[in-house]
Amino acid sequence: MAANFWNSSHYKQLLDPEEVDVVHDLDKERGISIDDFKLIKFHMSNHIMKLAQHIKVRQRVVATAITYMRRVYIRKSMVEFEPRLVALTCLYLASKAEESIVQARNLVFYIKRLYPDEYNKYELKDILGMEMKVLEALDYYLVVFHPYRSLSEFLQDAALNDVNMNQITWGIVNDTYKMDLILVHPPYRIALACIYIASVHREKDITAWFEDLHEDMNLVKNIAMEILDFYENYRTITEEKVNSAFSKLALKL
């Protein structure tokens, strides 16, 4: 629960859930529904994660890149800002913001190896050209706070920092970036929700520890339910649904 989060641009940009689930008019004209909108962002989050594994950047860079991508689509339509190019550009920008710089040409090289049919038309100049547009869409606010630091501190404080709990909670936090939680909730509260889910799964009673935090558990449990709902809905995601969503943007997969 870093003290300077509350004075940060990240805190000031937190949104209400209904502000996040808004399809822009240009996208609506293409028939994009709210489910399509979420599905495309989910798909691009996976692309960023997979590409990051190949270029070997820290998880924080991945999380920042996905946050940038999701912030862009609060203000810009997918018709205006092509999702694949935005995803690539956000990873490039995040690597610089997090001081773990990746060469743009390496991004182009690896993404074409991973997804040759989807990214064959993109070159170095496209990423560099989109970079300024993304920066403008972000209002040049590049600072992002993540749940990871709070997660480690909470696990240690609750005496839950064994290897298994670390792996489970870290994995859940990673999965939250396939959703818009980071745009809506303070990162420390997302961390608490992930610990809550893991503690129930592992049958660890940490009720007293949560009570000592004097945190609103209704808020924590609501986030936990959002995560669990995502896991349930994740099972129904098919390649056919992804293709259908992208086809409405006239983006051939």
Curated annotation (Swiss-Prot):
Protein name per the record: Cyclin-C1-1
Q: Which GO terms describe its biological process?
A: cell division; regulation of transcription by RNA polymerase II
SMART domains recorded: CYCLIN
| InterPro entries cross-referenced by the UniProt entry | Cyclin-like_dom, Cyclin-like_sf, Cyclin/Ssn8, Cyclin_N
Q: Which PANTHER family match?
A: CYCLIN
Q: Which GO terms describe its molecular function?
A: cyclin-dependent protein serine/threonine kinase regulator activity
Q: Keywords of this protein's UniProt record, alphabetized? A: Cell cycle, Cell division, Cyclin
* CDD domains, A to Z: CYCLIN_AtCycC_rpt1 (cd20571), CYCLIN_AtCycC_rpt2 (cd20572)
Is Methyltransferase included in the keywords of this UniProt record? no
Query: Disulfide bonds, which pairs?
Result: none
The record's annotation in Gene3D superfamilies points to: Cyclin-like (1.10.472.10)
Q: Which family does it belong to?
A: Belongs to the cyclin family. Cyclin C subfamily.
